[in-house]
Amino acid sequence: MQTATALEDSANAPSPAASSQGQFDREIVPIDTADAGNSTKRSPLKVALIMVALCCAVFLHALDNTIITTALPTITAAFDLDAAYTWIGSTYLLAVAASTMVWAKISDVFGRKPIILSANLCFFTGSLIAALSANFAMLIAARAIQGIGGAGVNVLANICVGDLFSQRKRGLYYGVIGGVWAVALSLGPVVGGSLTESISWRWCFYINLPLCAVVFVIIILLLDVKTPKTPFGKGIAAIDWVGAALSIGSTLMILLALSLGGQTEPWNSATVICLVVFGFIGWILCFSWEASLAKYPLLPVSIFKQIPTLAVLAACFIQSYAFVASAYYLPLYFQAVLGATPILSGVYLLPTAVSISISSTATGVYMRKTGQYLTPIYIGFVLQTLGYGLFIDLGPTANWAKIIVFQIIGGLGVGFNFQAPMVALQAFISPRELAMATSAYNFMRNVSGAISVVIGQTVFQNEMSKHQESLATILGPQLAAKLAGTGASASTDLIRSLPSPQRDVVHGVFANSMKSMWIMYTAFSAAALVVCPFLGKMVLREDHTETVTGLAAENAAREERLRQEKEKKDAKIRKCQVN
């Protein structure tokens, strides 16, 4: 038997933010397992190959987030849909958010490599079913399967980087992954539109099949991580299925409420209210279960007990909230106001994608050289707030100098915080909690994005409603009604078909309505500057022991957690006896 070490928080360790060296006091807990081992020395070539494998996997998932956006009108016509077409995108995002944390915990038990391969296979299966869909229900089911697989691929790529590299080094690799993500998101509409126009919308899904196969082979050959020999039955029994059911069910209820509210159901409808209420009750039950009853918790409750980690999650929420706004509403501006085609709107978004890639990678280099993360986080939120504030000045006519410069400023800000908060979060936790904390971070990012789209759309629709009388006078009641409510953001083709005088009026109304939305996003982004002082200052560690996965490691972590809880209770009893 080999002996490895897992670094666990000492029960009486001081706050990391208060430590002069910015590091935890750690206690070494022996883990006896044949699968354990110390960090492997890898050559630069080996590291590069590992990153190629992970980046390919992330690229595929990110591309699928946006590749269908330009194919939606064609898919809508093929299946004779109405407002239900929005579920083609929503189903994918719901599945991603709901399944992220479960994938992370399964990988703690069975190891990273077999689980990321399973996630890739799940994504492949969903893509194949989507490409062959004979009806709308089949397509929606396929998108759910795709989302589940995509969630696993994305979160496990981030977890693998945390497993393999020290805090000091991993910032660079996270920065590279962030850059790949931004480029893929921008290319999605262009690739999807080109495939739809030249071949068929089904190729938006067929294209995933050879790419998935290549990624599968690359991961098998290049991803060098240790895999425990966990018996399948015992491993399945060790998963916290109660916590998984509570977290998935609660998340789905809340996100379904956000998807339905203001779209197919009024916000004050019984359906929406019940989904929200029972969703929050479910999360309260989930936290209670994870904190006191779960044998192998799905959620690291400890991160919600420290101010710095709570601040990091808040920063993550704000960054994702703003990023989704640019990814979702800038294309709407390009199409509805400037009259761009969906493909061109993807091209016009390139300044945002390129600037995010540059600042995300630069942040990783900075963290690797200095061991600090606070400076890029502060700079990022300042630039992000400035950039989104400048978006308020975008008018009904194209001013390309403004459009490009404003995107660069906002994109740089978003990129500085694309991965830095995740590194900050990992600096405050024990290595055994890395997978759970990383999944919680990704979960927060996904939920924030969903909320951002809904709130942004609500603000925009409310502003559009204020102009209905003037639009009805110019366009007539029927055309004006198509630009009201939920139809506003889905009417870009209608706007392009209008005669020039009427089209100019509509462009002005859309531009003015979007100003209020950008004001909201600017104010929300500025709130991050209030959160930043609570992040805590840590020096990123250079030493590293690779995370050990498997049942033996899970049992050791549980025993250590129970020991710490007992010591805290004993300390309280002694304090009461003294008093």
From Swiss-Prot:
Region (Disordered): 1-23
Composition-biased stretches (Low complexity): 10-20
GO cellular component: plasma membrane
Stretches that traverse the bilayer: 48-68, 83-103, 121-141, 145-165, 171-191, 203-223, 236-256, 269-289, 298-318, 336-356, 374-394, 403-423, 438-460, 516-536
Pfam families named in the record: MFS_1
Matching CDD domains: MFS_Azr1_MDR_like
Localization (cell): Membrane
Signal peptide: none
Coiled-coil intervals, chain numbering: none
InterPro entries reported in the protein's UniProt record: MFS, MFS_dom, MFS_trans_sf
Membrane topology: Multi-pass membrane protein
Highest rank taxon of the organism: Eukaryota
PROSITE patterns: MFS (PS50850)
GO terms, molecular function: transmembrane transporter activity
Glycan-modified residues: N38
Predominant place of localization: membrane
Keyword Transport recorded: yes
Key words, A-Z: Glycoprotein, Membrane, Transmembrane, Transmembrane helix, Transport
Main function: MFS-type transporter; part of the gene cluster that mediates the biosynthesis of pyrrolopyrazines, secondary metabolites showing insecticidal activity. Probably involved in the secretion of peramine and other pyrrolopyrazines.
Assigned protein family: Belongs to the major facilitator superfamily. TCR/Tet family.
PANTHER family, per the entry: DRUG TRANSPORTER, PUTATIVE (AFU_ORTHOLOGUE AFUA_3G08530)-RELATED, MAJOR FACILITATOR SUPERFAMILY
Name under which the protein is recorded: MFS-type transporter ppz2
